[in-house]
Amino acid sequence: MIKEIKIYDEIIEVTNKNLVMIIAKSHTCSSCNTIANTMDNNMKHFDKIEKFNVFVDDNDRFRGEFLIFSVPTVLIFSEGKELLRQSRYFDYAKIDRLIEMFSS
């Protein structure tokens, strides 16, 4: 299940966890929900990754500090370090391999 984060300080807090996926979305983006649902379904077998949505329309600071120029954007972090960033086109196999590598 994907949780929503609204407060910038919470975003910083979760990026410092072991393995986290953040999906940057917009309220006006029609494909964002589809991508988020696909990511959630594809990641069900990975129990060690936490998944979060952040609406960039509601959080300008997140958009600016994390350099989100388009949505949807998927960010994967481990212990405060960005491991992966993908926007618009998503290589699900690459995401799976990365999560598998860092969750073992």
Annotate each predicted stretch with a short phrase.
Residues 1-19, 100, 104:
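N-terminal leader/targeting and pre-domain segments
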Residues 2-5, 24, 40-43, 47-61:
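Thiol-based oxidoreductase modules, predominantly thioredoxin-like and allied folds used
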Residues 3, 34-37, 65-66, 97:
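Chalcogenol-based redox active-site neighborhoods
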Residues 9-42:
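Local sequence-structure signature of Cys/Sec-based thiol-disulfide redox active-site neighborhoods
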Residues 30, 58-61, 90-93:
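Short alpha-helical
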Residues 66-75:
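Structural micro-motif
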Residues 76-104:
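Non-catalytic, surface beta->alpha helical segment in thiol-disulfide oxidoreductase systems
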